[in-house]
Regions:
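Pyridoxal 5′-phosphate
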Residues: 1-363
């Protein structure tokens, strides 16, 4: 199988990730629940994961909360920052993991910047939304549909100028693009563990600068006499037993990412450029621009879902449809058709793109 669906989850992971998960399952008990060796090893595995995340995201280990996925982290962050009925600025390319929690809170959502790959439009409309009275902002770093890299540093600066706290959704950028919590000044950054960080599914991170409200309540292994959750992070947001094997695997994935420097970003970007150029030669409508990560979408001449299935029958794994982001499709004008999405990973190589283009051309 030629796997080109890294926007959904990483599939080919570094061997160290598999080894770390198995080692944790065989040697670690529950952290914070005992002073014996296996419990201590579990605590060490979890703390090591936080330390590695701190190195990658420019934050302290205690600012790193382990979650089950990026959606989990976004729900905590949004419910911590956004008041029911509050006015919130978002980009025109947000995922349902952002939009549905906002809708559930009855937030007044102001959509700012609907032009693909157009930083001027994004910043102009985002500035207007902030000045119109937004009291919070939530925006993605990279569109999960189109790979559009938003000007998040400039958007963060606008938020700071207006005194508006903000949340960054790093679902499609963590592990590939630089993401720095304290330098950016976000209240929260949410990231999945299983995508660009190359960890197991069922893992994620919430990086915290702001005051966080618990989403779940229960045991933490500390301050058990209290009727409410502890005040200190990360315990305040981690009720119940931590996913120790997941944390160990995520730690190994992040260590691999750190060891690669900018290689992964460069490899993905090379294939996106090649893919866009080759699709254009085939006369296929592809969405490609100046500010693009390792994802590209195109609209075939037939139903997207059927086209993706035909690619699957040829051993090529891609994603088709609305990708849980109808707002992004509405902005790009593809809400009725959806798109076929190709997303590369750390193993991005010419032969993958060549095989994809050959299959598309034959179809």
């Amino acid at each position: 199988m030629i796997y080109l669906d890294y926007g959904a989850t990483s599939f080919h992971k570094p061997p160290a990730v598999y080894r770390a998960v198995e080692r944790a399952m065989r040697t670690c008990a529950s952290p914070g629940r005992g002073g014996y060796g296996a419990a201590q090893r579990g605590a060490e595995a979890v703390f090591s994961c936080r330390e590695t995340a701190g190195k990658l995201f420019d934050c302290r280990p205690e600012q790193v909360v382990l979650t089950t996925n990026c959606t989990h982290g976004l729900n905590i962050a949004i419910r911590s920052l956004v008041k029911p009925g509050g006015r919130v600025a978002v980009s025109g390319f947000e995922h349902n993991a952002v939009m549905r929690p906002l809708y559930a809170l009855g937030a007044e959502v102001q959509v700012a910047g609907r032009h693909l790959f157009d930083w001027d439009n994004t910043l102009e409309e985002f500035r207007r939304a902030l000045r119109a009275g937004a009291n919070a902002a939530v925006f993605t770093h990279v569109s999960n549909v189109f790979g559009y890299i938003l000007p998040v540093e400039e958007m963060a600066a606008l938020c700071r100028e207006q005194g508006v706290p903000f949340i960054l959704d790093a679902a499609q950028s963590a592990g590939t693009l630089p993401v720095k919590l304290n330098a950016l000044g976000a209240e929260f950054i949410a990231a999945p563990g299983h995508k660009g960080l190359l960890g197991p599914q069922g893992t994620g991170l919430l990086l915290c600068r702001g005051e966080a409200a618990p989403l779940l309540f229960g045991g933490t292994g500390s301050e058990s006499i209290r009727k409410d959750m502890p005040d200190m992070l990360p315990e305040r947001l981690e009720a119940g037993t931590v996913n120790v094997p997941g944390a160990a695997g995520l730690d190994a994935g992040m260590r691999y990412v750190l060891s690669q420097g900018s290689r992964i970003e460069a490899a993905e970007h090379r294939q996106i450029r090649r893919c866009a150029r080759m699709l254009e030669k085939l006369g296929v409508q592809a969405f490609y621009g100046a500010h693009q990560a390792g994802t590209i979408s195109f609209v075939p001449r037939e139903d997207c879902e059927a086209f993706a299935q035909r690619l699957a029958d040829r051993g090529i794994a891609v994603r088709a449809g609305l990708h849980c982001a109808p707002l992004a499709h509405e902005s790009a004008g593809t809400l009725e058709t959806g798109t076929v999405r190709v997303s590369f990973g750390p193993d991005a190589a010419d032969w993958q793109t060549d095989a994809l283009i050959k299959a598309v051309g034959n179809m």
